[in-house]
């Protein structure tokens, strides 16, 4: 009788003991989006970021901009369709996306921080930041 009770107990307990390593199939991705080719690339890149967050709202996303890639982060910047980038950037920031701007680009292009949208982060080198995020922090690399 004791064996039957033990067997039933183990049978009932078995489903609870099954441990799935992926209890959340959509975990927090860590992704760096690399933008360096102007407004067209930026428009596509922001759309990709929106899609990424729709698929995985927990994603940790950093957008690193340098060279012509900083242009969309300037005050008054608009896409080829005439849409202001400022609102899209602000919406993504509210979802936790971080935007980092290359200070070398600013220096070489004679640009000032005052010309850019608020709440941006500035890094010494955009390229070095992309490498650092990949190598040291385990971010996946995406370039639209």
Model regions: which residues?
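Active-site-proximal beta-strand/loop segments in catalytic clefts of secreted hydrolases
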Residues: 35-38, 64-68, 103-105, 125, ...
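Mid-chain, structured segments of secreted extracytoplasmic proteins
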Residues: 62-111
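Stable alpha-helical elements in mature extracytoplasmic
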Residues: 41-48, 81, 85-88, 98, ...
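N-terminal secretory signal peptides
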Residues: 20-64, 68-72
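C-terminal partner/receptor-binding element of secreted or periplasmic proteins
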Residues: 118-144
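N-terminal signal peptide c-region/cleavage motif recognized by signal peptidases
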Residues: 14-18
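Structured segments of extracytoplasmic/periplasmic soluble domains
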Residues: 48-56, 91-95, 105-109, 123, ...
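Sec-dependent N-terminal signal peptides
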Residues: 4-13
């Amino acid at each position: 009788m004791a064996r039957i009770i033990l067997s039933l107990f183990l049978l009932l307990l078995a489903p609870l003991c099954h441990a799935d390593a992926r209890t959340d199939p959509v975990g927090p991705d860590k992704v760096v989006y690399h933008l360096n080719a102007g407004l067209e690339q930026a428009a596509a890149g922001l759309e990709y970021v929106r899609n990424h967050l729709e698929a995985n709202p927990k994603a940790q996303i950093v957008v690193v901009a340098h060279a012509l890639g900083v242009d969309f982060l300037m005050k008054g910047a608009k896409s080829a369709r005439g849409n202001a980038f400022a609102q899209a950037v602000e919406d993504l920031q509210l979802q936790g996306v971080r935007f980092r701007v290359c200070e070398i680009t600013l220096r070489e292009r004679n640009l000032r921080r005052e010309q850019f949208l608020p709440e941006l982060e500035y890094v010494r080198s955009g390229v070095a930041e992309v490498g650092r995020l990949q190598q040291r922090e385990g971010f996946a690399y995406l370039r639209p």
